[in-house]
């Protein structure tokens, strides 16, 4: 077995600074039944909306929420942390089943946190985000665990 390593920079240009996410209720990262397939086409389809969000809203990423259903960004899973509970979308074919996401949820359960995998809406996200102590993060191979500071 060989292990190859190479230095890389931060995935997001903001580095350790919390991200600004634009909530996008009209578009999707990819076709609904193709979300769990890790392919270049699925990432590429999100690039145009992400570039527009950066230019027009100074957003770091887009959180795709078709019809108000919170899903994922162009390259990472979304996690909401409300006190001792982690809420994230239930696994289905509309988004990528991230290994980093699974690892984080396993560690959270092992630490005694409540992990809730279910659909949740933009309205619920905004309502919970108003509560003191509520946090949000993106998880992914490149993103690792990156904090979200602002929802636009």
Predicted regions and their residues:
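Helix-start/capping segments and mature chain N-termini
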Residues: 2-152
């Amino acid at each position: 077995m060989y292990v190859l390593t190479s230095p890389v920079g931060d995935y997001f240009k903001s580095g350790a600074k919390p991200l600004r996410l634009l909530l996008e209720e009209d578009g999707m990262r990819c076709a609904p039944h193709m979300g769990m397939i890790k392919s270049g086409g699925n990432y590429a389809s999100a690039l145009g909306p992400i570039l527009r969000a950066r230019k027009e809203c100074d957003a770091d990423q887009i959180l795709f929420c078709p019809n108000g259903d919170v899903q994922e960004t162009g390259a990472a899973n979304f996690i909401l942390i409300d006190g001792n509970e982690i809420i994230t979308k239930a696994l289905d074919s509309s988004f990528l089943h991230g290994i980093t996401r699974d690892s984080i949820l396993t560690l959270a359960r092992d630490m005694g946190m409540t992990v809730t995998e279910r659909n949740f809406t933009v309205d619920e996200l905004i309502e919970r985000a108003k509560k003191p102590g509520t946090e949000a993060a993106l998880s992914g191979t490149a993103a690792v665990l990156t904090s979200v500071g602002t929802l636009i």
